[in-house]
Amino acid sequence: MANTVQARKRARQAVKQNEHNSSLRSKLRTSIKAVRKAIEAGDKAAAAKVFAATQSTIDKIADKKIAHKNTAARQKSRLSAAIKAMAA
């Protein structure tokens, strides 16, 4: 239990930050699913368009340290490889 004024404030801030970060992680997962759905549909143009937006989202979340930079790089790499494999 937070006893000091500062500790109570930090506890309030932590709750607020957690909600914000959770919404960003959810947005990230949703955008990744959209890319995978476009890949499964076989529409390379749509997949590339959605991937560009998703790539931006992944980078923003990694910059804010909500997701680790290596995790972000891995996600982008795997999605990019899946899109490139569609042409083959």
From Swiss-Prot:
Entry's family note: Belongs to the bacterial ribosomal protein bS20 family.
GO cellular component, as recorded: cytosol; small ribosomal subunit
Cysteine pairs bridged by disulfides in the record: none
Protein name: Small ribosomal subunit protein bS20
Region (Disordered): 1-28
Highest taxon listed in the record's lineage: Bacteria
GO annotation, biological process: translation
